[in-house]
Every structure is written in C-alpha cells, then in structure tokens.
Regions:
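Charge-rich, acidic-biased intrinsically disordered regions
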Residues: 74-80, 122, 315-338, 364-365
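Divalent metal-cofactor coordination and adjacent catalytic microenvironments
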Residues: 101-104, 109, 295-325, 329-332, ...
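Aromatic side chains
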Residues: 147-149, 286, 296
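Short acidic alpha-helical/loop segments enriched in Asp/Glu that coordinate divalent cations
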Residues: 264, 272-285, 310-319
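Small-residue-rich helix-loop
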Residues: 290-292
C-alpha cells in the first residue's frame, strides 16, 4: 500500500476518529450501568416536582449560555464555526445543549450523532442529539470498553459520518445512583394524592343509650352534617358522644416526608436545597446575586459545563490548539456595565490593554475576527 502510494503520488487522507472505544465508567452490573435502563425512568422521575425543578435549573441555565471558540495558548476569541451556533438542524443551540445536560444528569452520558463532516479534515460540521433510550452498546469481553453502538437496533460506525460523539458526565446518572430516593419521593407523593382523593372519616357519633332505628340514625347524621356547615360548635345529648378518628396530613407526616425528600433530591442533583424551597434549608446568610450565581456555577453547573467543553475541545471535533468554552463571563456572570467600564478604564490607564482591545471587550469593535462565521 505504501509502495503504491509512492508510485502514484497519492496521499492518504487523515481519518479523525470520534473518541474510539469509550470506556465504561463506574461500577459495571447488568442492572446499574450507564448503558442499561434504570429502575426508575426519566419521565417517571420528572413527576417529582423537586427533581423537575433541579433539572430545569441545571439544563435551562447552561442551555442559555453561548459557546465560543478560543485559541488555547492566548485565550483569543476566534470565529465560531456554524455548528457552535446551531449544532443540529432540528432545533436551536439552547435546546440541544439543554437536553445534553439532561442526558448527563439522568444517565451519566449523552450522545450526538455526526450527520455532516468537513471535506477538508473529516471533522464533524453538524450533529443530531440522540436520546439515551435509543442507544445500546456492545462491550468487549471484559466489559471495560465499548466495541460498537447501535441506534434503534442499527449498528453505527465508530468514527466519521454517522458515528456517535459521547459526552461522559463527571458523576453517575441519578437514575442509577438515586433510584431509591426517587422511588421514595414518588411513593410519598402517591400516598398523599390517594389520601386527598379518598378522605377518611374524621369521626363518628357514639350512642350510649338505646339503639335508634335506621331512619333516625340517618336523620341525626344529616342534621349533624348540616349544622357543621353552618357553625363549628355542636350540642350533644347525654346519650351521644363524638369520637375523633381522622388523621390530618400533618399527623400522617406527608408534609415532613415531602420536604425531607425534596432536600435529598436536591443533594442528589448537587443543587442547593433552598433552590427547591425545602423548609429545613431556608436559613442562609445574606449573599448578593453575583456571589450566589458564582456559588451555583462552581458547585452545580461547572461539572456539566466542563464535561461538554472538554468533549467539544477534543481533537476529533476541534483543531488542536483551539478550545470550545461557554461564554460565562459575558452572560451568566455579566456584571453591571458601569462596573465593567470602570475596570476597563483602569486597564487602559495602566496600559494593560489598548483602546481597540477595550472596544473588543465590550463588543464595540467593527474589526477583528469576532462575529465572523466560518463555513
């Protein structure tokens, strides 16, 4: 093959492989591994309001932050390829990123299928988000590495057009690690709904005298019901006693159980419990909006952000020397414009930056590569 290419002068095109043979992370078992269905499904889990709130906070927040291309050595912002602005033809970038975070949260991994590639180097130019329920994997004999993937039962290539780009979470999916917690939250919620739909009798009238005929009993109960609708006090004869047997939701401890499980769900999703309005976590010190956002970014959002940034910056997608980053500072952590201008002015006075660079920092520059789109 090498002799033939030297004689004909043909050069072999470099084949950029898409993370060939991804490793199976976490403990392997046929029931609790990232490539198998969990005991609690995603749709069922989202029936827990606290979990839906955590999911929306994580996926919704990250999905709204734009992606930018930077030069790794200098941090210079480069022109973004089209797929950074819209990875999939089928939905906006924010939706694709939000459901990528959704997959990482619930399953511990996410999938994009390569639907277009650049002719020059074979790197992907368009993707399609693939639901985890559609993907199955064939492992090697040691159950350590993936040999092949299949979408809807059809095996796909491991590189190039039609292959899967795999995003691996820094944590296991909550459908595997939090099965018992999610199931408990669902059970308590179901029990409270059943109790509300089929209320128990709150008490009964006990006759200590002679037995009454059924017609008089019904008349007595009707009179009691009518009186209770008009006033809260009642009068009973010496032969009648009222016995209370009902339990309020507080006595049944539904409220306490729901609040406690809301806290556990928040811990499971690595979200501060006060974001889901858990009563036992309402006491907190004062923090301004910026500091609260920084804490939420560092503790909750960053693991998902890093997983996506690092995967999109790998050599099979982005040219070596460049990195893909979320534009966090100018969006999620954007400061007061007056404060930003004051800082820029100080940097100009100290001759740390030029006026042109300052204009670029505030998106006022008409020149440069910022904003250019490359096919």
């Amino acid at each position: 093959m090498g002799i033939l290419s030297r004689l004909t002068g043909a050069t072999q095109k470099t084949n950029v492989e898409a993370q060939y043979a991804p490793q199976v992370l976490g403990e392997y078992s046929p029931y609790a591994m990232p490539f198998q269905f969990a005991y609690v499904g995603r749709t069922e889990a989202l029936g827990v309001p606290a979990l839906a709130r955590c999911r929306n906070l994580l996926a919704g927040t990250i999905g709204t932050i734009p992606l930018m291309l930077h030069k790794k050595s200098t941090g210079e912002m480069l022109g973004s390829p089209l797929w950074l602005d819209q990875p999939s033809y089928h939905q906006p970038r924010s939706v694709t990123i939000a459901y990528t975070v959704d997959s990482l949260l619930f399953y511990g991994q996410a999938f994009w299928q390569v639907v277009e590639v650049y002719q020059e180097d074979g790197r992907p130019s368009r993707f399609e988000w693939i639901a985890n329920s559609r993907v199955t994997a064939t492992l090697d004999r040691d159950n350590v590495f993936v040999k092949s993937y299949a979408i809807d039962g059809t095996t796909v290539p491991m590189d190039g057009l039609g292959s899967l780009i795999t995003f691996q979470s820094l944590n296991d999916g909550i459908l595997n690690t939090g099965t018992s917690t999610i199931r408990a939250a669902l059970d308590v919620q179901k029990a409270s709904v059943v109790a509300a739909a089929t209320p128990m009798a709150t008490g009964y009238l006990k006759n200590t005298g002679a037995d009454l005929p059924p017609s008089e009993v019904q008349g007595l109960l009707s009179a009691w019901k009518s009186a209770r609708q008009n006033r809260s006090t009642a009068y009973l004869t010496s032969t009648l006693n009222y016995e209370s047997v009902g339990f309020s939701p507080k006595d049944m401890m539904y409220n306490e159980a729901i609040q406690n499980l809301a806290t556990e769900i928040a811990r499971l999703c690595n979200v501060p419990p006060y974001y889901v309005s858990a009563d036992q976590n309402t006491t907190m010190t004062y923090a301004n909006v910026t500091e609260e956002r920084k804490q939420f970014l560092t503790l909750s959002l960053q693991p998902f952000i890093s997983a996506i940034e690092d995967r999109l910056s790998m050599d099979d997608i982005t040219a070596r020397g460049n990195v893909v980053l979320f534009d966090i500072d100018k969006n999620y952590l954007r400061t007061d414009p007056l404060v930003e201008l004051a800082v820029i002015r100080e940097m100009i006075d100290l001759q740390l930056i030029t006026v042109e660079q300052a204009m670029g920092m505030t998106d006022l520059t008409p020149n440069g590569s910022h904003g250019m789109i490359y096919e």
